[in-house]
């Protein structure tokens, strides 16, 4: 597997100058605002449970891991899960569209849930509590403060459109939360992603026309983390946003892994898979988001540095469905136009590392199919591809990846699989830090699917989550969706954990 290790600083500087000219006038901001609602929730353990089942996973095989249990299942009218999950000190929280469930992270036993996503916001009195379009939720564990952070968007017909964010008051996910609701855009927010950096919580999201749901721009916002952790009132919790023009692709924020902070003064990195023909295809753009909470109007988002990627063709020809399934002519959305899952950062002391993935088309004599391409970047201020690889050992389609890296530099990628003979299921592959650059070990099956999605919508989750246990900093947790029987929207989810041999804590 080819590894690109030698992007020089001169090359990066030339790319930065050229690309900055091309992007002139296409970034708007800073746009400074503050929370519109602040309250404290009822304890999550006291919120009513829904009848929505957590299905048993008779199909799940035994793997060389720690945990492989059923997560939450589908709800009528909810076409896909967008499964998000994170481990805390003793618990694992999974979000799917519209509901939460809290598990014992060691046994998989349900502690609380399923709980309606908007019920945690019942004390807010705004659309975060009342809208039945509360979805696109994500969860993360802030390992620096030992608290949970949950978010979703509320998008009732006609607005207002709010980003609903909750920060737990302790490390117990079943307890109370500080509730903050933000109006980051006057239009429809779509597919928000949540990230941790020492100076802020960050959200990146697309902004759509409220009526047509057509893409208008992408947006990235900083939320005042220290104030939210302290539970201060809404008027004193600021937000700082930047947004691109309609011609700029989706922004994706970077989340800190581990306890080692970035070097002093290093700011949030924002990434963008840029496939615009007039800008030159196969670029990965990186920006630097500097927040100034003492004077928010002095905040900046600089860049991009344009990183030329090894040549590829987008999975599914950019945004078109193409993933086949057995027993139906319906094909699934492959999300080839964006980075999928989380983008995560680690400071190893002697170097800094960022990992990410997206879906491409791999063509061989056996034909074409969607495949996972993954990257490890070093020195993110002037990004250098340290290693990259493609996961495509056969003719099965692989897409919707989630990636993370442990404290030893081991990398794992989870993803969906499907083909005309393989039902949509879940697998993962690992790269130990001692393995040859760009190579993944033999993939492991988490769940063998036994059904196809037969709905004509063709949508599939655009998000799955690989995360790291904050206690040992080396146990991986992964959650994604699959089908056990053919139906229009009867998806199920799975939660699994595993370790590399280097993880001995």
Per-range role (PLM):
Residues 10-20:
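Bacterial N-terminal signal peptides
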Residues 25-505:
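C-terminal PAP-associated
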Residues 2-11:
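Bacterial N-terminal signal peptides that target proteins for export
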